[in-house]
Curated annotation (Swiss-Prot):
Main location: membrane
The protein's name: Cytochrome c biogenesis ATP-binding export protein CcmA 1
EC number: 7.6.2.5
Subunit structure: The complex is composed of two ATP-binding proteins (CcmA) and two transmembrane proteins (CcmB).
GO MF annotation, one: ABC-type heme transporter activity
Residues forming coiled coils: none
UniProt function note: Part of the ABC transporter complex CcmAB involved in the biogenesis of c-type cytochromes; once thought to export heme, this seems not to be the case, but its exact role is uncertain. Responsible for energy coupling to the transport system.
Enzymatic class: translocase
Membrane topology value: Peripheral membrane protein
Amino acid sequence: MLEARDLYCERDERTLFRGLSFTVDAGEWVQVTGGNGAGKTTLLRLLTGLARPDGGEVYWQGEPLRRVRDSFHRSLLWIGHQPGIKTRLTARENLHFFHPGDGARLPEALAQAGLAGFEDVPVARLSAGQQRRVALARLWLTRAALWVLDEPFTAIDVNGVARLTRRMAAHTAQGGMVILTTHQPLPGAADTVRRLALTGGEAGL
């Protein structure tokens, strides 16, 4: 379980949120919503330990995140707004970098992400959407319980969004957890996704 307790965050003397508390249990996914500058990416960075809140605490499995950072990161898949891939490598080589023991599974993961036939193309030659898919192919390889995804559908077409949404639904159905930001509707998932709205100051599920 991931838990936020009474989080407070301020940027440039402006309060992004205060008193923010919620939990994400096994089998749940949460969509963080809010306008530009509302603090969506900042919140994800706090939840992953990449930044510290100005007040409050994040907990993992009942322990303060700062005390269990190593075990937490073994349970985490974080994909930020930037793809975080190496443009000089091919799609296959990028996945191998993150998942060196899964060589036989790499082609299928890339196919699931819509990159069949592009496995050995240098990433620098791929479109922005295809580069995003290289990063998201990790969703078919990772064993992490918690997925935190910042705008995963950027530059992804409608069919790709549907495919990725189905993968997230399968992950939560197996007891995984998903937290994501997106401005796009989640096809077929409206009844299962909890929404956390950041509106400046207070926030609520």
